[in-house]
Amino acid sequence: KPMVVFGMGGHASFPVCIAAKTLGIPFIIYENNIQIGKSNKYLLPFACKIFTSYEELVGIKNKYDHKVVVTGNIIREEILNFKKKNQFTEDVLNILVLGGSQAAKSFGEILPGVFQECKKENVNIKIFQQCTESQNTKLNEAYKNLNFDFELFNFTNNISEYFSKAQLVITRSGSSVTAELINCKIPFISIPYPHATDSHQDKNATYFEKKGYSISVKETEVNKKLFSLIKSFYKDRKLLDRMIEQQKKHSDKEVFVRINKTIKKLLNE
């Protein structure tokens, strides 16, 4: 019989935590979005603690504030220990485009037009873009016609290799990838998925922008705003440096120390 159960949020951990409650086993839940998820919201009244990635947590009642422990993001050791190796030049801006299958498809459709504007305005960029296999040929032809350096990839087990190459990232505002970017001190433009449950990606993006970690652009405004942002970053790298300085104020290095300390204290009560 376990002494404590740790639920990482989402549908998978929900029945396990309910079983723990039924058996009288204390459990802890973890929320890595700014907006508490539905499963965690239901479980919170019965949980001993809720670990959070950031200081802000939307969607909980004040009476549960005492259960909140800000631990930071639970992320891979490879990312926790990430150190950027590449040296960058002022005459080119390296942009990494990240997204899962849905995001990759959307970005593959809307970004070529933005990058075409960069070419017209002599904004010298190099693109590393995650795309779906079905987009390989079309994007390859489009970017070759624009005559700038680019690399397309579908999936990688070594994302840190691409992080090392990036000065700016264009991504959705899901909790996992943004946590890794903040830890690696890489400025990013987040384009929230407009149909995310409880608009949690919008809330993540708003929080990150408020903190100065990133810039948020709604998908409906990409064609209007994204080129201007890229041009600004290309012309003035200090804008990127400011975001990096803000990201340095957030640290996940002690996340496992904080978690272990809280669990040990709980078990000794």
Predicted regions and their residues:
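Acidic donor-binding loop of glycosyltransferase active sites
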Residues: 2-4, 164-179, 186-187
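Short hydrophobic beta-strand element within catalytic cores of glycosyltransferases
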Residues: 171, 187-198
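C-terminal "capping" alpha-helix adjacent to the active site of nucleotide-linked donor transferases
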Residues: 211-212, 216-238
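An aromatic- and histidine-rich active-site surface loop
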Residues: 4-23
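C-terminal alpha-helical cap of glycosyltransferases
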Residues: 252-269
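Donor-nucleotide binding loops and adjacent catalytic segments primarily
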Residues: 83-169, 202-205, 217-226
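Active-site-proximal region of nucleotide-activated glycan assembly enzymes
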Residues: 21-82
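A short, well-ordered alpha-helix in the C-terminal region of glycosyltransferases
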Residues: 239-253
